[in-house]
Amino acid sequence: LIDCVQRFFSKHHVGKLLARCNGMKEKGVSPVSLFRYKLSNIFVGRSMYMQQQTGSFKEAFSKNTFYRFLNSAKTNWLRFTSLLAADIVNHDIKGLTNDSRKNVFIIDDSLFNRTSCKKTELGSKVFDHTDMRFKKGFRMLTLSWSDGNTLIPVNSCLLASAKTTNIIGPVKDFDNRTLAGKRRKLAQTKAPEAMMALLDTALSVGLNADYVLFDSWFSNPVQITAIHSKGMDVIAMIKKSSRIKYSYGGKPVSYTHL
């Protein structure tokens, strides 16, 4: 299994992608070695803590080096996952289907639950659409690419509450020109606007699709027209609103008349 991870890293040039996303170190063990170790542990169900407790940890780096790399505020993980997804789609997936197949972007959000948020940065009370009540944690907004048979996750972001009154955890100050500042600003952006940021990142790395799929939570006229201006059509659930009119049979009609 670890050999499979190594072949995947070599085939998709993961080290170069990390470097393009500022995942670098000044000296010592290479970042790609740290990342390969982390990914290998996930697939084999191991952890650094248990390896150190049992004496089976044989890597040439310390715990502090490993966690400094994972917690670095300078690595653009959102762009990294987008670049990796684009490499997989463009070099492995697209060759398996013909040009007439319609590709899509799929956007959805889910609850990232936390039992306590008092010490979690930007931890919030967020609305769970499944249970129809507020819970502690974040909303996880995810963008995926699909050709109808294969689903490839592209990027994602954690969304805190856009209302400061619903934020439970600490709020740290960062320069908005830095990557850390931009990520925290994105986390406090409303979901329809954050969706456009994820789409723009996916398009900027060479991914493309014919349609964008999402539910009624994102189907606002502003977002639909913005997506259409990027050369894609929208397939979505209609939002129940008396203020929104839809064109049907050449006439503007409300949701209740469709």
Predicted regions and their residues:
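Gly/serine-rich nucleotide phosphate-binding loop at the start of the catalytic core
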Residues: 1-78
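Short, charged/polar micro-motifs that form catalytic or ligand-binding hotspots
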Residues: 24, 56, 129-133, 185-188, ...
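Short, conserved catalytic/metal-binding motifs centered on acidic residues
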Residues: 37-38, 51-53, 66, 101-115, ...
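Electropositive, glycine- and tryptophan-enriched low-complexity nucleic-acid-binding patches
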Residues: 65, 130-207
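Active-site-proximal, Lys/Arg-enriched surface segment
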Residues: 72-162
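Short, well-ordered, mixed-charge alpha-helical segments that flank or form enzyme active sites
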Residues: 113-116, 151-152, 162-167, 219-222, ...
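Domain-level cores of phosphate- or acyl-group-handling catalytic modules
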Residues: 173-250
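Conserved small/polar residues in nucleotide/adenosyl-binding loops
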Residues: 256-257
